[in-house]
């Protein structure tokens, strides 16, 4: 073999770190898309429950009533759901407190069912006054957190989400960008923060479960390599 002859370089292989980062980025995008569509679906369902207050079940215009809100509301709810669902596991990792309480899909589905039930109660049950409605929904929302979360970070994020979402919603209403069909604006404000709090806890649980599944898949792939 001649001295000047050099071997042609073979195909470059990505290191395990680059491969892991790429895999995590793709999984993060997939989780965001899944959370977005879950948020859009829940927004449509919960909007239907609010519209159905004091109305017979499945009226003729039920399909039209699902999309009676402003067109941009479901996408905004989906975007917020994606942000919340991705934020919860990130906060857990940052605090070094991995959430391990009731980490299975059956628990997550029960949490979603309870959240829908809380929203259904706010739409269907008649209370004597708005204070009684607020206290009842607050107790139910905190009960949802205690049953399916019990983390300090989850409670803190839920309160922050409820406060921020309520303020943004009120600003939109005051500026005429969005309006409620209910003539009793005080009634709406009495249940809105509780619904946002419960929704934040619910989407956080979904996001945590998706993140835990991603960690399992990445761990299995790295073990195989």
Swiss-Prot record:
The modification Phosphoserine is found at residue 151. It is found in: Endoplasmic reticulum membrane. The modification Cysteine sulfenic acid (-SOH) is found at residue 215. Residues 1-28, 89-103, 149-153, 208-225 are cytoplasmic. It holds the Pfam family INSIG. Residues 52-70, 127-129, 176-189 are lumenal. Its main location: endoplasmic reticulum. Phosphorylation at Ser-151 by PCK1 reduces binding to oxysterol, disrupting the interaction between INSIG2 and SCAP, thereby promoting nuclear translocation of SREBP proteins (SREBF1/SREBP1 or SREBF2/SREBP2) and subsequent transcription of downstream lipogenesis-related genes. Polyubiquitinated by AMFR/gp78 at Cys-215 in some tissues such as adipose tissues, undifferentiated myoblasts and liver, leading to its degradation. In differentiated myotubes, Cys-215 oxidation prevents ubiquitination at the same site, resulting in protein stabilization. One of its GO terms (molecular function) is protein sequestering activity. Belongs to the INSIG family. Binds oxysterols in a pocket within their transmembrane domains and interacts with SCAP via transmembrane domains 3 and 4. The KxHxx motif mediates association with the coatomer complex. The chain crosses the membrane at residues 29-51, 71-88, 104-126, 130-148, 154-175, 190-207. Keywords: Cholesterol metabolism, Endoplasmic reticulum, Lipid metabolism, Lipid-binding, Membrane, Oxidation, Phosphoprotein, Steroid metabolism, Sterol metabolism, Thioester bond, Transmembrane, Transmembrane helix, Ubl conjugation. Interacts with SCAP; interaction is direct and only takes place in the presence of sterols; it prevents interaction between SCAP and the coat protein complex II (COPII). Associates with the SCAP-SREBP complex (composed of SCAP and SREBF1/SREBP1 or SREBF2/SREBP2); association is mediated via its interaction with SCAP and only takes place in the presence of sterols. Interacts with RNF139. Interacts with RNF145. One of its GO terms (biological process) is inner ear morphogenesis. This is Insulin-induced gene 2 protein. A motif (KxHxx) lies at residues 219-225. Oxysterol-binding protein that mediates feedback control of cholesterol synthesis by controlling both endoplasmic reticulum to Golgi transport of SCAP and degradation of HMGCR. Acts as a negative regulator of cholesterol biosynthesis by mediating the retention of the SCAP-SREBP complex in the endoplasmic reticulum, thereby blocking the processing of sterol regulatory element-binding proteins (SREBPs) SREBF1/SREBP1 and SREBF2/SREBP2. The keyword Transmembrane applies. There is a cross-link at residue 215 (Glycyl cysteine thioester (Cys-Gly) (interchain with G-Cter in ubiquitin)). The record marks 115 as: Required for the recognition of 25-hydroxycholesterol. One of its GO terms (cellular component) is SREBP-SCAP-Insig complex. It is a multi-pass membrane protein.
